[in-house]
Amino acid sequence: MIQKALGKIFGTKNDRIVKAYAKRVAKINALEPTYEKLSDDELKDKFSKLKEQVLAQKLTLDDALYDVFAIVREASKRVLKMRHFDVQLIGGMVLHDGNIAEMKTGEGKTLVATLPVVLNAMNKKGVHVVTVNDYLAKRDAADMGVLYNFLGFSVGVILGGNYDDKARKEAYNCDITYGTNNEFGFDYLRDNMKFRKEDKVQRGHNFVIVDEVDSILIDEARTPLIISGPTNRTLDGYIKANEVAKQMKCGEPADPLDKNSKATGDFTLDEKNRAVMITEAGISKAEKLFGVDNLYSLDNAVLSHYLDQALKANYLFEKDVHYVVKDGQVVIVDEFTGRLSEGRRFSEGLHQALEAKEGVKIQEESQTLADITFQNYFRLYDKLSGMTGTAQTEATEFSQIYKLEVISIPTNLPVKRIDQNDLIYKTEKEKFDAVIAQIKYLHAKGQPVLVGTASIEKSEKLHELLTKEKINHSVLNAKNHEKEAQIIANAGDKGAVTIATNMAGRGVDIKINDEVRALGGLYILGTERHESRRIDNQLRGRSGRQGDPGESRFYLSLEDNLLRIFGSDKIKHIMERLGLKEGESIESRLVTKAVENAQKKVESLHFESRKYILEYDDVANEQRKVIYRYRNELLEADFDLHDKIISNREDYIANVLDRLEIFDGDSKENFDIQKITSIIKSETTEILDENKLSKAEDYKELKEEIIKELRDFYEEKMAPVDNEQRKSIEKMLYLQIVDRDWREHLYQMDILKTGIGLRGYNHRDPLTEYKKESYNLFVELVMRLKSDSIRTLHSIRFKTQEEIEAERRAIAELQAKLQEEEQKKLKMSGADKGGEDLEETKNVPYRAPKKIGRNEPCPCGSGKKYKDCHGKSGPKKGLFANND
């Protein structure tokens, strides 16, 4: 209350910031007459000279801002036929300063971005513009590219599905690159899995503008980007667990206020946290159905995990709400956009459980090869900024997580949209009856209406009801998204009725004509409050763009998920006291406030969830930075790895002696020479001279002798190749080892994270425990990298030239022999057909020779089994092969 009163007297912090920017706008406006007089060539020449000064570091970007913004505005007038408004100049400065510009729908965010994009592209380090989908990336790159090209900048676009490294590298090497958050993030992960530096596509992380920043940095922040590979684990457990889950009954949780109260049924649901709790009765039932004595023994730990996921799949996740079945696959529906998330899968076996539930092919479980959260990816940039129509409700999170300030930019024209109070009904049926009646009324008078739904299921239900009423309408959901932009663009036509899930069509303006303005503009009808106030505000923001009239209202029921799960009993009591009859609703600011409080509860839960994920990922992120830095040093190194190999060899030998409890200061009586040589032989294939080792008098002499012998073995091994080849081999092996050991480390970290929450029951902070144990795992990883590099380098064997030539001859003979046999078969086949021209056999396609079994005799005539002869060397490629 006090803050509000002070705000009215002195203005809010946001007001003061905007006023400060407005003073700078006056300086830009003062330059407009000067640049208006210049010809196109003179304008380009002026800009080129500014760019040269920036590159020569004679001028900072901040110093150049006034002239650059004035030039961009003038260039835009000439090539785009659009002039930046003063408020758009303010938005551009907010973005350049690395903050979030909150601008209402229709205020021209795409045009605003051109100002800081051009300014920050002048230093030739690259600017990335992130959009929510490929359509917007392609559209904005094409539309704004005309302006950028006029000023001498190149523009690239990164699209999903096109993974040609050369094309992507060219796009990243452009001055300005457009793409989606997923594509930028995955390219970063893929770059850190490349084996040649020239194959990397990204060139750094300088400046990024994130369009619809709330959607990307808030809504999608709970879902990390993961590159994974198959694990070859059995999938039968998911099918069995699904059968068991279907036989279990959901009950009610115990009353926390009654000590004697017990949970009923086989399991209970916590819908707020999407969790399942199995009761004692449920455990007994599951053990009987699985045929095991103890569901939670170590031997059955996997079974209990399968059952937990099967229960979630069957009782918490709904088809056409959380996912759809498309072309025999379970595809996730993005809960914030209503779009299908093709290629994305639920983790921890939940996706496999859903596949078992729906009876489609169960895909293999995957193992993480590389991962990163959006929070940590976007924090890689030297400067991060964003723009959206709705960010103030999440200002605290933007500040705490990303160090970004949200600044609301005034609209160019006053907002005329009327936002009505919510109408609340007892049941969903009554609500939908009222919704249909309102749509019929609006449709009859020709006022366009955009109907927002929270799920595909609800949008299809509305579709059926409107079809019965013979009202022409369009439906836009994840099942029907091909014409998304067109459907949304036409939603402002007279008499149009459009049903859309959540914020489908974001980034596409709904324009109306004068006739529709006279009818009251676009009517927004929400059929359910979303868990986030932001999503509701986005829906409302589709109407009333650029000073147009409009109206919005939400229709709710006590059976809606938000009110049922999170709503207080206050709303229910009010409705009961009023004694409402069927079909009657309540409209009250008090009730609307109660609904907003329910939304705040959910937002708080989600914020804590994202914060929790980030706190844990921050631990992994520090380790990721170290490994990726080390890997990049290897990848980009033109130097010899000789010194690193020497150092790693010393550490490896120290580790071997440590494992045998041989320490510095020990006498030679404590040296078990046979064990030392046995371990080193098993790990490196090298056979040490026991006599020489026996002569060592102390730890230092023993260690030096082992180092000398291994070094000599290695030098002898590398003798057949020249220095450049050796460097290339060593680099490749080191990179492979880093990737393999990092992959295993991520798996260990996943296991640690899965069970760490249980530490809380022992009054220990899970996060502290996770930090401590993950550090220990990382120390082990570093040691393993050193040891594995030495083991692998010493295990390689180069083929001699004689061996290579012998193999080539044997393979050539084998192929000739097989082809001769094949020709005989073909001729016999022609003769059997009774006088057919045998010359025709020349045109018969070549057939691959029969595959030789690994245990069959090798066709080369050596007398060995195929696997021990040419079957051993055949599949191996390159200069060397591992001695397995």
Swiss-Prot record:
It catalyses: ATP + H2O + cellular proteinSide 1 = ADP + phosphate + cellular proteinSide 2. It comes from the Bacteria. It is found in: Cell inner membrane; Cytoplasm. May bind 1 zinc ion per subunit. SMART domains: HELICc, SecA_DEAD, SecA_PP_bind. One of its GO terms (cellular component) is cell envelope Sec protein transport complex. It is a peripheral membrane protein. Pfam families: P-loop_SecA, SEC-C, SecA_DEAD, SecA_PP_bind, SecA_SW. The keyword Cell wall biogenesis/degradation does not apply. Its main location: membrane. Zn(2+) binds at residues 858, 860, 869-870. Keywords: ATP-binding, Cell inner membrane, Cell membrane, Cytoplasm, Membrane, Metal-binding, Nucleotide-binding, Protein transport, Translocase, Translocation, Transport, Zinc. The keyword Transport applies. Residues 833-842 have a biased composition (Basic and acidic residues). Belongs to the SecA family. Part of the Sec protein translocase complex. Interacts with the SecYEG preprotein conducting channel. Has a central role in coupling the hydrolysis of ATP to the transfer of proteins into and across the cell membrane, serving as an ATP-driven molecular motor driving the stepwise translocation of polypeptide chains across the membrane. HAMAP family: SecA. NCBIfam families: PRK09200.1 (NF006630), PRK12904.1 (NF009538), secA (TIGR00963). This is Protein translocase subunit SecA. It comes from Campylobacter hominis (strain ATCC BAA-381 / DSM 21671 / CCUG 45161 / LMG 19568 / NCTC 13146 / CH001A). The lineage of its organism: Bacteria, Pseudomonadati, Campylobacterota, Epsilonproteobacteria, Campylobacterales.
